[in-house]
Structure formats: structure tokens, C-alpha cells
Amino acid sequence: MEGIFSHLDGDGSPRMVDVTGKAETARTAVAEGWVTLGGEIAGRLAAGESHKGDVLKIAETAGIMAVKRTPELIPLCHGIRIERVDLKCSFSKTTGRIYITCSVAARDVTGVEMEALTGVSVAALTVYDMCKGISKNMTIEGIRLLSKTGGKSGDYAAGGAEKE
């Protein structure tokens, strides 16, 4: 149902949405987000001076792992069979920003929007964690759903992707 808080019952108590009568369909979702790095962090990342390993690859791995664990992190999120995750972190030396995208696909009774958003969020948090020893001057921003397909509510596409 649109227009209501579907995870609350009539008394306002939390509940998991009943999906028992829904048919499996192909579902996709794409989310994006940014980490803006302070000058010192950006310079050291551009120079490959991380002592903890490849920051972007580790963030990508963390984001993929998070997609698979979304129902453990979001209490009322259904566990679904993830069929594909494509998570990418790209660093712009000119802006000092890391652009993160996460695309998720499944064939199930509920969508994968939360999984895509969780992947981006955890990848961004991993960048922060790996770089905070240099400086806390970082901003995580712009995490949003770019698109989704499948399901009763139909397709969705946000306007104005910000990719650099």
C-alpha cells in the first residue's frame, strides 16, 4: 500500500509486512552516494599512501557484504535471494570525492532498494573508517535511490544523477 507506513500496524506497533500472497518477479535497484574527503586525505589517497590497503577495494567488498546482510541491520527488512551485486567506488582526484554506486538484482516477492542503499551506506562508512586516522574531515552525503524496477509499485527513476 502506498501512502501509509507499511511497517506499522493500526496501533502504531512495528510489524513485518506480509508478503505471503505476492508473486516472485525480477527486481532491481540502484543507489548512489558520495564521500567528500578533506584535502590531506584526498592527496594521500591519490598518491596511493594508504597503510591499511586499497581503500576503494575494501569499501567495495564491505558494501557487497552489507547487501547480503541487510535484514540483519534493518529490523523489518525481509531476507531475499540476492542474485547480483555490482558495487563500485570511484575516486576523483580533481574534486577529492568518492562516488559510490550499488546495483542489486533478485527474483523475489519484495524489492531490493534497502539492499542497494545499505551497500552504498556501508561502503561510505568503510571509507570513513579507513581514512579517519589521517583526518576526520570527511562528509558522507547524497545517499539515495536512483532507480528500481519490478514489483507492485512499478518502476522508479530519480532525476539528476550526479556522476562526475
For the regions a language model picked out, list residue spans one by one.
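C-terminal binding/interaction regions
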Residues: 1-56, 61-164
